[in-house]
UniProtKB/Swiss-Prot annotation:
PTM remark: Autophosphorylated on Tyr and Thr residues.
Post-translational modification Phosphotyrosine, affected residues: Y931, Y1028
Annotated TM spans: 773-793
EC number: 2.7.10.1, 2.7.11.1
Domain Protein kinase as annotated: residue spans: 858-1136
Signal sequence, start to end: 1-23
Positions annotated as active site in the UniProt record: D985 (proton acceptor)
Glycosylation: residue positions: 32, 96, 112, 156, 212, 227, 257, 362, 373, 461, 532, 558, 638, 722, 743
Residue window of motif Cys pair 1: 65-72
Protein name: Receptor-like protein kinase BRI1-like 3
GO CC terms in record: plasma membrane
Extracellular topology ranges: 24-772
Function: Receptor with a dual specificity kinase activity acting on both serine/threonine- and tyrosine-containing substrates. Binds brassinolide. Regulates, in response to brassinosteroid binding, a signaling cascade involved in plant development. May be involved in cell growth and vascular differentiation.
Species this chain originates from: Arabidopsis thaliana
Length: 1164
């Protein structure tokens, strides 16, 4: 309180003493500067954890020029303030600093300032302002600075969260500004046509990259731009098929970056490029350009140093005219459809080229030996083409001192041996020749390259072994990836000298001998893969010393001894980062014992997905799933191992209790060993576990009840042990197939036969010799009599039940059979009175027979819908209540898991915008799901069959309510459920409408849990429904939350247009709703997309166009540009002044709890 009064008095003193009624200065300038700096500290700094401003103390004799970050002029006035990377947090009130009349430079980047008040300053003398890398959100600060600080030369607002529309440019009074950086914010909407032209002619550098601004590029005006040298619009949503004419006015332009937008058509040709006489860097990468590279582009060759056209759909080859590009140093044409011989005819003549990137094209033939003429070449990437022949041997000839650092020719069709001449490339750091057909030894000269850090040659037919001299002369090697070859011999002890090693992958070779204990000295080692070899001996306990080890795969060897408890010694201590950002693919084995181990991790840089799908480790297993992406750590500083596979060895002893402390472990496979003892109760600490395989051992005792709390567990196998007792009820343990518990004679309970209800056997006691024989005989007679009575009663009851069963079966046989699929009950041993497992109390006495009766034997008359995973029937129960029953189709090897996954996904989730699962039933091969019945059926039916007799017309108010409800339900699945849920088949037929027309998201038949293992979900077939499938699914087959967002965008577009996603009569055979709408939207004809029946509504078309814009963002072809469903809800909230009943967007809250229950009476 005392400090607050002191601050108030200080502010009043500054206000009163600075200027008297006649304008005379009564307080010295230096005191005024001190007061303003102190006011800034008091009002803007809420947290200073490192005491960065510790010496900022106000008082008599305090000189601010001695304060940290403050610089002063010779007369003691504050002219500069540099607080960059100070760890400061607070609300930035910029006017306290702009009031410093002599302040010329202000650097606050790298802190955590949020937006504050910046509207009341009377002036600003700043010349340099850097507020980058903070948490600013209010874009009005940009307008304030542009209109107030008239002496600005450089301003940087990059890497904040500034949102809204780009509005004003600097005032015309500002004649000095040269640099403006607004990159990596959240600016959106269409960029004003004159935004760039309105900048003063002094402007040299303008960076708008990393936002979401839209508009037709050809309509932008660049004005005179006579001094503009750097312009970037990269990573936005700019469209158009032409360049603006006024851009050619920028004669001094040196860097033009338009990458990662939606520019279409062909790259401009003619004489357009001849206007740029100083252009050094041009990037048109990752747009939608097609056709051939125009020869006229070579008009830039006199000055061009960097050209990036990657990530388009360009065809043909590099024109011959590019041989004149004598200044070109970096050329990136990767990820196109180029072909031809331009490498030898054009590229080999570019003498100054240093970086050449051509991966993922269609270039065939031999790798031209003429490329060795490029003596300055540092990086050569020819991965994923169609090259044949041998690896050229002349890159590092004796005549030239090669500077080659990276040689990447993975995923081609090269044969022959690895050239020994590569050993002369003394600058070589990375060699990747993976996925070819190379044979022979790896030359010893390569192993001794002084700078070699990455040796990657997996998936070849290489022979020989790892030399004893590895890393003897230095430990620069970081990645050694030689899996899936024919390597022999043992691992040398000298591998312990590779002190920088991060990733060792030698799986699937012919290695023998023991694992060197010295590997435990590799503190940086993160991934060790030695599976599928013939290694012997014990698992070294020293591996527990590897402080960064997160992935250990030793499966399918001949290892013996006990499980080392030391493997868990780093639990809670592992630090992230050592292999972050590396491209990988994980091939998960889901085919049981036909393929050994849980799967295989492979380096995936430069490999086509379709090539991997045909790799033996994939197609030789009955069922596999491929996960791919970038390595990311899920912890900050308290991590543990995430993958441990020691299966198919001869390891014995008990399972160490400490393994349960590995809280981030996702896969633990100890199956097919000789383990004894019990399953540790500490396994309840494996909170992230997704796969747990303890099968084919000699484990005894009970299944720990703690396993029931493992909410991420998606695959459990404890079969072929000696386990006893009941399977713990609760969690997911009862949802796994019977085979996962098989051959444990003492186990019982769901899904195995029920446990005996009789009393447990008691111990026998010896009777005294003198015990009365008569007493024993009497007891025997009484016992026999009781047994006879009980037997008679049991026979009577059994006869009564049998009679009742026959009556019910006779009735059921009289029912018509389903017209959709045949029933498979002939071999069913369960009685038809088997109970339906339910999640709702009112249904707890429901049986399978009741369901048969309620649906008239699942007759065609009762069927109300059909989906990709089964038919849906309407069932009226005996009490008059109505439910919907989905009868899942049977898919070999998948039906049970789809059924179990759906139960676990839906059964524990309650939300007013989700269709609740009431119960389930499994009998024979039939799988049934019982849902709450939705009165008005699907949105698809209501929306697109409104013209039929009795159809319902949805006005805009109803459609808006449905759009918001469906978004809320999907956002709940994506963000609130633990684990998160990806729908995978979001469409209008899966949005159901209840009696109040509230939207309910349904049909999780294709859903998968995003567990710790399933960060990206890969499937063997394309997920989703045509018309709703995002474009990236056709390339990667990976299902993501952003894919669901795209599908939701289609639903929103349906609501706005009233049109079906696919309608050949409306859009033609080669187009659909999305393509049609995008074309109109690009042409500024968005109003033509809207359903005419909606435009006449009282809301008008303005609000509709806002919703259309949200749909457009959801339908962006680039997943990273799409909003999350939370952001969609936020945009709805900004648009809607919610006055409809029970539809408050303000109360949309996310509850991150393992089991999410939300009352339907409570507003989300």
């Amino acid at each position: 309180m005392k400090q607050q009064w002191q601050f108030l008095i200080l502010c009043l003193l500054v206000l009163f003493l600075t200027v008297d009624s006649r304008g005379r200065r009564l307080l010295s300038d230096d005191v005024n500067d001190t007061a303003l700096l102190t006011a800034f500290k008091q009002t803007s700094i809420k947290s200073d954890p490192t005491n960065f401003l510790g010496n900022w103390r106000y008082g008599s004799g305090r000189d601010p020029c001695t304060w940290r970050g403050v610089s002063c002029s010779s007369d003691g006035r504050v002219i500069g303030l540099d607080l960059r990377n100070g760890g400061l947090t607070g609300t930035l009130n910029l006017n306290n600093l702009t009031a410093l009349s002599n302040l010329r430079s202000l650097y606050l980047q790298g802190n955590n300032f949020s937006s504050g008040d910046s509207s009341s300053s009377s002036g600003c003398s700043l010349e340099v302002l850097d507020l980058s890398s903070n948490s600013l959100t209010d874009s009005s600060i940009v307008d304030y600075v542009f209109s107030t600080c008239l002496n600005l030369v450089s301003v940087n607002f990059s890497h904040n969260k500034l949102a809204g529309k780009l509005k004003s440019s600097p005032s015309a009074s500002n004649k000095r500004i040269t640099t403006v950086d607004l990159s990596n914010n959240r600016f959106s909407d269409e960029i004003p046509e004159t935004f760039i032209a309105d900048f003063p002619n002094s402007l040299k550098h303008l960076d708008l990259s990393g936002n979401n601004v839209t508009g037709d590029f050809s309509r932008l005006s660049f004005g005179l731009c006579e001094n503009l040298t750097v312009f970037s619009l990269s990573q936005n949503s700019i469209s158009g098929d032409r360049f603006p004419v006024s851009l050619s006015n920028c004669k001094l332009l040196e860097t033009l970056n338009l990458s990662r937008n939606s520019l279409i058509g062909k790259i401009p040709g003619d004489d357009y490029w001849g206007n740029f006489q100083n252009l050094r860097q041009l990037s048109l990468a990752h747009n939608l350009y097609s056709g051939e590279i125009p020869p006229e582009l070579s008009l830039l060759c006199r000055t061009l140093e960097v050209l990036d056209l990657s990530g388009n759909s360009l065809t043909g080859q590099l024109p011959q005219s590019f041989t004149s590009c004598g200044s070109l140093q970096s050329l990136n044409l990767g990820n196109n459809k180029l072909s031809g011989d331009f490498l030898s005819t054009v590229v080999s003549k570019l003498s100054r080229i240093t970086n050449l990137y051509l991966p993922f094209n269609n270039i065939s033939g031999s790798v031209p030996i003429s490329l060795t003429n490029c003596s300055n070449l540092r990086v050569l990437d020819l991965s994923s083409n169609e090259f044949t022949g041998e690896v050229p041997s002349g890159f590092c000839s004796l005549q030239s001192s090669s500077v080659l650092e990276k040689l990447l020719i993975a995923n081609n069709y090269l044969s022959g041996t690895v050239p020994v001449e590569l050993g002369k490339c003394k600058s070589l750091k990375t060699i990747d020749l993976s996925f070819n057909a190379l044979t022979g030894l790896i030359p010893k000269e390569i192993w001794t390259l002084p700078k070699l850090s990455d040796l990657v040659m997996w998936a070849n037919n290489l022979t020989g072994g790892i030399p004893e001299s590895i890393c003897v002369d230095g430990g620069n090697l970081e990645t050694l990836i030689l899996n899936n070859n024919l390597l022999t011999g043992s691992l040398p002890e000298s591998i312990s000298k590779c002190t920088n090693m991060l990733w060792i992958s030698l799986s699937s070779n012919l290695l023998t001998g023991e694992i060197p204990v010295g590997i435990g000295k590799l503190e940086k080692l993160a991934i060790l893969q030695l599976g599928n070899n013939s290694l012997t001996g014990n698992i070294p306990s020293e591996l527990g010393n590897c402080k960064n080890l997160i992935w250990l795969d030793l499966n399918s060897n001949n290892l013996t001894g006990n499980l080392p408890g030391e493997l868990a010694s780093q639990a809670g201590l592992v630090m992230p980062g050592s292999v972050s950002g590396k491209q990988f693919a994980f091939v998960r084995n889901e085919g049981g014992t036909d393929c050994r181990g849980a799967g295989g991790l492979v380096e995936f840089e430069g490999i086509r997905a379709e090539r991997l799908e045909h790799f033996p480790m994939v197609h030789s297993c009955p069922k596999t799933r491929i996960y791919s992406g970038m390595t990311m750590y899920m912890f900050s500083s308290n991590g543990s191992m995430i993958y441990l596979d020691l299966s198919y060895n001869a390891v014995s002893g008990s399972i160490p209790l400490g393994y349960g402390a590995m809280g981030y472990l996702q896969v633990l496979n100890l199956g097919h060993n000789l383990l004894t003892g019990t399953i540790p109760d500490s396994f309840g600490g494996l909170k992230a576990i997704g796969v747990l395989d303890l099968s084919h051992n000699d484990l005894q005792g009970f299944l720990p009840g703690s396993l029931g709390g493992l909410s991420f567990l998606s695959d459990l196998d404890v079969s072929n042990n000696n386990l006893t007792g009941p399977i713990p009820f609760g969690g997911q343990l009862t949802t796994f197939p019977l085979t996962r518990y098989a051959n444990n004679s003492g186990l019982c309970g769901v899904p195995l036969p029920p446990c005996s209800s009789g009393s447990r056997p008691t111990r026998s006691h010896a009777h005294p010799k003198k015990q009365s024989i008569a007493t024993g005989m009497s007891a025997g007679i009484v016992f026999s009599f009781m047994c006879i009575v009980m037997l008679i009663m049991a026979l009577y009851r059994a006869r009564k039940v049998q009679k009742k069963e026959k009556q019910r079966e006779k009735y059921i046989e009289s029912l018509p059979t389903s017209g959709s699929s045949s029933w498979k009950l002939s071999s069913v041993h369960e009685p038809l009175s088997i109970n339906v497992a339910t999640f709702e109390k009112p249904l707890r006495k429901l049986t399978f027979a009741h369901l048969l009766e309620a649906t008239n034997g699942f007759s065609a008359d009762s069927m109300i819908g059909s989906g990709g995973f089964g038919d849906v029937y309407k069932a009226k129960l005996a009490d008059g209540s109505v439910v919907a029953i989905k009868k899942l189709i049977q898919v070999t090897g998948q039906g049970d898991r789809e059924f179990m996954a759906e139960m676990e996904t839906i059964g524990k989730i309650k939300h007013r915008n989700l269709v609740p699962l009431l119960g389930y039933c499994k009998i024979g091969e039939e799988r049934l799901l019982v849902y709450e019945y939705m009165k008005y059926g699907s949105l698809e039916t209501v929306l697109h069959e409104k013209t039929k007799k009795g159809g319902i017309f949805l006005d805009w108010s109803a459609r808006k309510k449905i759009a918001i409800g469906a978004a809320r339900g999907l956002a709940f699945l994506h963000h609130s459920c633990i684990p998160h849920i990806i729908h995978r088949d979001m469409k209008s037929s899966n949005v159901l409408l209840d009696q109040d027309f509230v939207a309910r998201v349904s049909d999780f038949g294709m859903a998968r849990l995003v567990s710790a293992l399933d960060t990206h979900l890969s499937v063997s077939t394309l997920a989703g429904t045509p018309g709703y499938v995002p474009p990236e699914y056709y390339q990667s087959f990976r299902c993501t939350a952003k894919g669901d967002v795209y599908s939701y965008g289609v639903i929103l577009l349906e609501l706005l247009s009233g049109k079906k996603p696919i309608d050949p009569e409306e859009f033609g055979e080669d187009n659909n709703l999305v393509g049609w709408a995008k074309q109109l939207y690009r042409e500024k004809r968005g109003a033509e997309i809207l359903d005419p029946e909606l435009v006449t509504d009282k809301s008008g078309d303005v609000e509709l166009l806002h919703y259309l814009k949200i749909a457009s963002q959801c339908l962006d072809d680039r997943p990273f540009k799409r909003p999350t469903m939370i952001q969609v809800m936020t945009m709805f909230k900004e648009l809607v002044q919610v006055d409809t009943e029970n539809d408050s967007l303000d109360e949309f809250l996310l509850k991150e709890t393992p089991l999410v229950e939300e009352s339907r009476d409570k507003e989300p």
